[in-house]
Amino acid sequence: MVSQLVLEEQTVTTLERPTPLAAEQPALEIVGALKRFHKDEGQKKAFWKRGERKPRELTIAVDHMTITVPRGEIFGLLGANGSGKSTLIRLVSTLLIPDGGEIRVFGHDVRREERLVRRLINRVSVEASFFKKLSALENLMYAARLYDMPIGEARQRAIYILGKLGMKEQRLYEPLENMSRGMQQKIAVARGLLTSPVLLLLDEPTTGLDPRSKQDVQRFILRMRREHDTTVFLTTHDMDEADRLCDRIAVIDDGKIVALDTPEGLKRQIGAQSGKNGSATMEDVFLALTGKSLDDDFEVEGDAVAEEE
């Protein structure tokens, strides 16, 4: 039976950390991060003389970004499609290798200490993958085994999180292939929260969710920060979400940071420049700093390039 949906929050335990974490240690340090890709020009392959090599154009997705995120902060990346925000998340999560600069998670380098970093983080992405024939609960239990969570604790916590995210008891055993994309995204968020990571990487976590489901996810993110000292590093297309959740926001454009401040600080700055003192919105901020709409499509395509520093 799934009567555990009504468990009190204090009964839910968390994974033991791999190493003690100093309170004064920044959760995330990004120093001059660089990532380049080969640009796909969409042209047919041409014949070249033997021994000659066709030059491949490079594009910079992350252009020497520097960010420090203190422990316990919710830090947001706001940018149009192709601005580099998802690439930066993948660099932090060790899914991509930086071509330059340094990235450290609680002092651990993402290249030299990859396994330690992965024990401290969890990532939720809009393109999350699942075993579609399995239920929500079975997918979360599988993820828990990868993190060596005790079965009883994992089941208890999975049921608790799914309940808090608004999943009804009778749907816990339903195959994911029968669920909407929005419901599957909720399960992706639950999977990311399952191990109570000390650094939670959220790549557009509420994309595809209805307004009530968005609020459920946002409330749980705030609860994770409050109760488990979780640091959150997120990308979003949702201006209201960035304003509501984030302690600080970096606006990025073409792989570069064009502004970094609190939501109120950014709105004051743009409001003073535009004559909208006290009435500027995050949309005003974004348009003023980038000249783009968040719906503009500038996605970078191609193969990753690993070059020597």
Please place each PLM-identified region on the residue numbering:
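Conserved ABC ATPase "signature" region
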Residues: 33, 44-51, 122, 141, ...
